[in-house]
């Protein structure tokens, strides 16, 4: 099954995570790049001109603000993170940013998905489509994911990871995510005592 872009946030006794996966049939030539406390999705070498074909394929997907990690499938990462830096709570930052930015105006009306979670495991995950918006609370000990296609309402998931590398691998091809096709790149932030980031570019 093809889900497109996927985000997941959650926590367990092992720690707190926020992860992201790009699955793509149209623009598979992309990679994750870490820049301080952020992860960006950019075209691979030789595919830089793809951004002129689709402006939505390059963006920050993870941003860490003190004890909070934001993860999304687009430029609204910066909007949500900016609101949180200004003092807005996670729920309002996620919901307002999704509502304001709306779904992507491409050929597929691609939904925007986004989430934020703190080091206590408290978070919110949401999606805005051409039909509406949904934002769900994530409690400590819970894990949820949502994708741009098919599974486009937050679903609970058994997510196994004890560090950033394992969280990155899991959303790429672990557990239920192994059933979803066309993985391109993945990344994750994980917090046990402090935030760490990892990424996978096959």
From Swiss-Prot:
Pfam family name, one: IMP_cyclohyd
Catalytic activity: IMP + H2O = 5-formamido-1-(5-phospho-D-ribosyl)imidazole-4-carboxamide
Catalytic activity, EC: 3.5.4.10
Record-level Gene Ontology MF annotations: IMP cyclohydrolase activity
General function of this protein: Catalyzes the cyclization of 5-formylamidoimidazole-4-carboxamide ribonucleotide to IMP.
Family: Belongs to the archaeal IMP cyclohydrolase family.
The protein's name: IMP cyclohydrolase
Organism: Methanosphaera stadtmanae (strain ATCC 43021 / DSM 3091 / JCM 11832 / MCB-3)
